[in-house]
């Protein structure tokens, strides 16, 4: 790893640190900052060797690129041609990719906020399908659900209904639009960053930190209201 003209090198074997050193020898590298990670499977555990799934590996790196705009990844695997993966627009590029070849109904709503060391990035867009697509992350780790999603759903449902009532799109006798109805055709990317997150579920991929719901709900409600007011055509869609 290179930073501040210093090279830090660490090697591990069977979970134990073998070597750690910091030097000034940066001339043999073709970059000024960054990290290289290499590994060899432990033959005591993987006795038959391993064969990495290149497609899955590339997909994971592409997601990391979306979550870290501007960061450049280089992927080289066996005899495949070296690839550079980078996203300049972050999750805005992600939404565009997810809705590729779909008929979109709205522009993209995007918000980004940082509060007390907790960060939230959200991009959403509706298409004309009946399928909802959620891509959720906490500290760049994929999640299948959690309190951040709960907070988002509450904010979305409340904001849409408040706007519809205010603009007379829903009459007094009309029932509120439900969260289930708002799921149809929704494409969402939600990146949540916080220190010491808590996870639950069998595979520990569900965020259960209670503060995530409160923060996401408050921030999304505020910015979504502004977006709806400024984009009436999208709001009606």
Task: Annotate the PLM regions.
Residues 3, 10-29, 52-60, 135-154, ...:
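Extended active-site and interfacial segments that coordinate phosphate-rich ligands
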Residues 7, 22, 36-37, 108, ...:
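Extended aliphatic helical segments
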Residues 1-97:
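GHKL-type ATPase core
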Residues 178-237:
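Extended, well-ordered alpha-helical scaffold/bundle regions in very large, multi-domain proteins
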Residues 5, 166-170, 230, 234:
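Short, polar/charged, Gly/Pro-enriched helix-capping and turn/loop motifs at alpha-helix termini
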Residues 43-52, 170, 200, 226-230:
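Short, polar/flexible loop-turn hinges at active-site or ligand-entry regions and domain interfaces
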Residues 55, 62-65, 70-202:
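GHKL/Histidine-kinase-like ATPase module
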């Amino acid at each position: 790893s290179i930073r501040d003209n210093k090279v830090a090198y660490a090697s591990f074997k069977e979970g134990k640190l073998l070597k750690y050193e910091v030097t000034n020898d940066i001339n043999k590298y073709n970059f000024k900052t960054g990290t290289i990670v290499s590994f060899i499977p432990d033959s005591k555990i993987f006795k038959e060797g391993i064969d990495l799934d290149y497609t899955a590996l590339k997909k994971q790196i592409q997601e990391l690129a979306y979550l870290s705009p501007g960061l450049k990844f280089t992927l080289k695997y066996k005899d495949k041609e070296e690839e550079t993966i980078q996203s300049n627009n972050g999750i805005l590029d992600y939404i565009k990719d997810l809705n590729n070849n779909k008929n979109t109904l709205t522009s993209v709503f995007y918000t980004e906020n940082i509060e007390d060391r907790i960060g939230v990035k959200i991009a959403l867009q509706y298409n004309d399908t009946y399928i909802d697509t959620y891509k959720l992350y906490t500290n760049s780790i994929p999640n299948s659900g959690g309190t951040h999603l709960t907070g988002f759903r509450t904010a979305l449902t409340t904001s849409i209904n408040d706007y519809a009532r205010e603009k007379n799109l829903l009459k007094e006798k009309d029932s509120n639009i439900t969260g289930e109805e708002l799921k149809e055709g929704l494409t969402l990317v939600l990146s949540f960053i916080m220190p010491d997150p808590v996870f639950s579920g069998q595979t520990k991929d569900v965020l259960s930190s209670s503060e995530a719901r409160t923060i996401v709900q408050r921030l999304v409600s505020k910015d979504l209201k502004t977006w709806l007011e400024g984009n009436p055509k999208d709001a009606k869609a």
